[in-house]
From Swiss-Prot:
GO terms of biological process kind: queuosine biosynthetic process
CDD domains, per the entry: Radical_SAM
Protein name stated in the entry: 7-carboxy-7-deazaguanine synthase
Entry EC no(s): 4.3.99.3
SUPFAM superfamilies, per the entry: Radical SAM enzymes (SSF102114)
Keyword Ion transport listed: no
Reaction(s) catalysed by this chain's protein: 6-carboxy-5,6,7,8-tetrahydropterin + H(+) = 7-carboxy-7-deazaguanine + NH4(+)
Gene: queE
Binding site for S-adenosyl-L-methionine: 92, 133-135, 173-176
Pathway: Purine metabolism; 7-cyano-7-deazaguanine biosynthesis
Record family assignment: Belongs to the radical SAM superfamily. 7-carboxy-7-deazaguanine synthase family.
Species this protein is from: Caulobacter vibrioides (strain ATCC 19089 / CIP 103742 / CB 15) (Caulobacter crescentus)
Amino acid sequence: MTYSVKEIFLTLQGEGGQAGKAAVFCRFSGCNLWSGREQDRAKAVCTFCDTDFVGTDGENGGKFATAEDLAAAVEAQWTGGPDDRLVVCTGGEPFLQLDDAAIAALHARGFQIAVETNGTITAPAGVDWICVSPKADAPVVQTSGQELKLVFPQEKAMPERFAALDFERFYLQPMDGPDRDANTQLAVAYCLSHPQWRLSVQTHKYLGLP
C-alpha cells in the first residue's frame, strides 16, 4: 500500500509513560473521528483535537510507496546509535495505515514501535507499546495495552468508564485550550482521590518542542 504521512521528526516524547525519551514521530495523515478541517469540527466525533494531520506537506512528510520506503524515512531522522530506537506512530489515526508490512520494516531497522491511537481499531500484531486515548462518542475496541491516556475532562468519557480495562498504566491528561489551567487542577484532584490514575502533562509544549 501507499502510506500517506503528514510529518516525520525527531523529538522527545512529551506525554505518558515514555515521557522524556528520544523518539522519531511518524504522523500518519487521516483520522476516522474528524476530517481535520475546521469547517467539520462541530460535527466531528472528536471536537477538541489540537493536531494538524491533513495532507502530506509537513516536515519530511509525503507518500511512501512501500513499507521499506517508509521505514527508511523514519530511520533517516534518528540521530542516535543502533540501540534504544523508538518510533511513535501517531496521527490522525495510525491504525488506518500502519500494517504488518510497515511493522516488519520498522522492526528490521531496530525500532521499538509505539502507537498513539483512539482505540477504535484493533491493533495489528507486533506493536510494542500501545497507548489508547479514548474519545467520548467513539467505541473502544482496543481494550488492552501499555497505557490508557484520557484527555480530561470529557463529559461523556469520565475515567470510571475505562478503569477496568486491561492497561498497565492509566493517565489523565488535562485538555488543552483556554481552560487548561482549570482542567489541570481538576485532573490533579481526580488523581489524588483515585490513585490508579496518574497525571500526564504535555511537557513538550512547555519546552517548545514539536
